Amino acid sequence: MATTRLLFLLVVAVMITMVRSATLHYNPTVINLDRGRPKLHIGMLTSWTNADNSQGTGFPSAGAFPLAIQYANNDMDILHGYDINFEWVDTHCDINLGMAAISDWWKRGFLGVIGPGCGCTYEGRLASALNFPMIDYACDENPVSNKEFYPTFLRTIPPSIQVVDSILLTLDMYDWNQVTVVVENITKYRNVFNTMKEQFDMREEWEILHEEYYAGFDPWDPDAAEPFTDIIQRTKKTTRIYVFFGDSGDLRQFAISALDVGILNSGDYAIVGAVIDLEIRDSQDYHSLEYTLEASDYLEQINQAYEQMFKLREYTRTDDERALEAMKSVLIVTGEPVLRSQAWHIYSAIVIDNALDEPFNGTLELKTDIDMASVYIFDATTELLKALDATLQAGGDMYDGSQVVSNLFNTSYRSKAKADYQFDENGDGVKSYVLLHRIPIPVGDGGMPPGSPGMYPIGTFVRAESGHWSFNKDPDLNPVWHNRDDPPLDMPVCGFHGELCTNWGLYLGTLIPAFIIIFGGGLGYYIYRKRAYEAALDSLVWKVDWKEVQTRESETNSQGFSMKSMVLSAISVISNAEKQQIFATIGTYRGTICAIHAVHKNHIDLTRAVRTELKLMRDMRHDNICPFIGACIDRPHICILMHYCAKGSLQDIMENDDIKLDSMFLASLIADLVKGLVYLHSSEIKSHGHLKSSNCVVDNRWVLQITDYGLHEFRKGQKEDVDLGEHAKLARKLWTAPEHLREGKSMHPGGTPKGDIYSFSIILTEMYSRQEPFHENDLELADIIARVSKGEVPPYRPVLNAVNEAAPDCVLTAIRACWVEDPMERPNIIEVRTMLAPLQKGLKPNILDNMIAIMERYTNNLEELVDERTQELQKEKAKTEQLLHRMLPPSIASQLIKGISVLPETFDMVSIFFSDIVGFLIHFSLSSCRLFCSSQVLPLLVPWLHSLLTLPLHLPLIWMNPLISSFAQPSWSALHSHSCSALHSS
């Protein structure tokens, strides 16, 4: 971006230098209107004369500029209250003069410029740098479409490359995918070809070849080398459709050359030409030069000049006849022609008069008719003034170029040509194109009577505001193809070299038997599958004989079902050793415990729709879909048997306070529910229709399964359950989507997937609040249902106070997305699964796997804990052994450590030292606290107090008489102070 800006500044600097060098030669012509009102000024650049003072391209079309100014000054709706004055400059197609005029007009406060009419990149870049509006009428350069560098530049003339869209539509219309493009080697037509080639390259099946002829070829010059014969000879064997990009006269000569080569006689070739110049032509102008001479009613010298020019080419009537014959195979795409009405002739005359009058003062030479440039000049002037008026009316700044031109982008206007033109998003002009074909003209044209052959429009190419082009064919006009009834093919049926038909005869004997075998096999397989399907429909594998269903014999309700086996009955399931609570009517069918769902009908008609439903139910197989066991149609036991899930429904679990639900538990149940809905919505059943927490059951493995799905035709027409109260009927609707509530009884029993998504959001609120839906809403059930179905803004939904505290953000986001009022704005179940993906982060697919993973982690931690506790136990054991050895004799301690019982012993003789505690303390308070250290005392003694009180406990062996002396000695020593512990008086 910085480099781009630097280049932009450099270009502007160069422009300023060029402007300064040209300022001395700048000579504008000023036209002022003074009616006593404020004056506004605009300028026009045109090439009135060439550098050699010969007549330029601006004559006589520039005469439309003062005419447009005059119309605006007289129009009460354009800049009312102002006089619009103008200046014009003859640039001679000199860039310096044009930029000098732009710079001067900008400094003098002009409001915009029309032109320059020649090259426009430098002038447009300068005007954009000055924020100065510029609308051109003849510029055909591609860079000016880039609004990053040319933000204030627009043009009423369509760029040449715009014709490519119409060319491609023509090729599409006739299925022409392979073409050879013949291009004049000049920038204008090379740009058109390159744009077309880019479109071809984007389509794999399209193929484009390319031929060029030299620039400046003059078909009227007898000395000019005719390039087309060689091109046609080189390409005719690999081409059927030619696309020609060159001048109109060159196209005429190319068609004549193709006729001379002989490729047009068979009708197998066609030419599509693009005529994108400024000339205004009649139906005869594309092929007949004689018509041009005879129809011209201008001055005599003009006819003489034309005749003199054509004599150089040795013109003969035969040329026109050959061109007319060649045009049978030519289609021409060109701009929508001007309606040659009386108003147009008046306009043309005024433009020419203006060109001959002040301020132009032109002279009448060879060219006496106006072209489309006059229309583009008139339109550019008018649209600029309208944009200024719109800016003024909006309170804007008319001197802000960007603000002024912003009123023109992507707008349509009525052109002076009496057709609807446009400015696109790049400020380029847009007009309609027509497809010309040689047919008998339906109306007189340019003096030729109806029925004369001519190139006449058979349809119009129109651009919509979206930028899309379409072809509007005239229903009354059809192309007349040369020597055939339909358009030619873009290649022969067998290819240009017969490659598409090679060896068909050789392989015919193999292909036909192979086809018969494949077709016969496919047909047989189809018949087999069809019969198998019909047999599956006719089979009664789903049918359950009520006699095979074992239920508890007790009183029954009106449908013949056991009343004691209804909801919340507490019986034991024989196949399960544990006591379990039963949450539905259950029975045993062929050894399988099943939930029995009564159908309140008197009989079942086994129509094809019912049998198809039963087959679909049998085919439903998924871990999170409750299996269908069968159906009983025996009166009065009409019912549906589903697999029984012992843990009950999700609603039962939510209401059971003994079951603690942590985040892992809830995440697992939600994941199961989502997986079940994904399978259900992708199956042929499509949707549940009555999804609620009571229809979500949990089996012994804590896997959630969806039940009560499908069989809508089977249940159709059943009576209401007489045992169901009014409150329960209303409570069932709390999960129903508002659009289904509004449908009432007309609701399809199967509902819709988006209705299931709404029900899913209500179930989520139950799971995280552990309460019934809408429990925090202070309204009766009937009022709640009425407000939900009403579709209020914002919609009435459950209060989420409890859910906000417990649920993670992803769940809250999913809830709010799933219960929006408009079903089309609700996510599908796949998108819901993505929303809730954070819940499953780090978790296994189901809750049992998660519990096993937790137990594995616990086991690993437990092993480490056991090792640690074992080491601590060993240390404590050692401490205990030491304590035992200190408290007990070694022999006794050893026996206890080994676990051997210590038996009591009997002694024949014992010596006991007696002393009361008081006397003992008084006596020994007079002694120092020392151990007995006499050699006569056994070293088994401990400190005095402990030793004297526990001496009998330390007898390791049975001693005889020495024992007496051993125990007597310390006693004697204590009494008589004969120990080495000196007694001292207090």
Curated annotation (Swiss-Prot):
First and last residue of the signal peptide: 1-21
Compartment list: Membrane
Alphabetical keyword list: cGMP biosynthesis, Glycoprotein, GTP-binding, Lyase, Membrane, Nucleotide-binding, Phosphoprotein, Receptor, Signal, Transmembrane, Transmembrane helix
BP GO annotations: receptor guanylyl cyclase signaling pathway
Residues with glycosylation annotation: 185, 361, 410
Extracellular side: 22-507
Taxonomic classification: Eukaryota, Metazoa, Echinodermata, Eleutherozoa, Echinozoa
PROSITE patterns referenced in this protein's UniProt entry, alphabetically: PROTEIN_KINASE_DOM
InterPro entries found in the cross-reference section: ANF_lig-bd_rcpt, Cyclic_nucleotide_synthase, HNOB_dom_associated, Kinase-like_dom_sf, Nucleotide_cyclase, Peripla_BP_I, Prot_kinase_dom, Ser-Thr/Tyr_kinase_cat_dom
Protein name per the record: Resact receptor
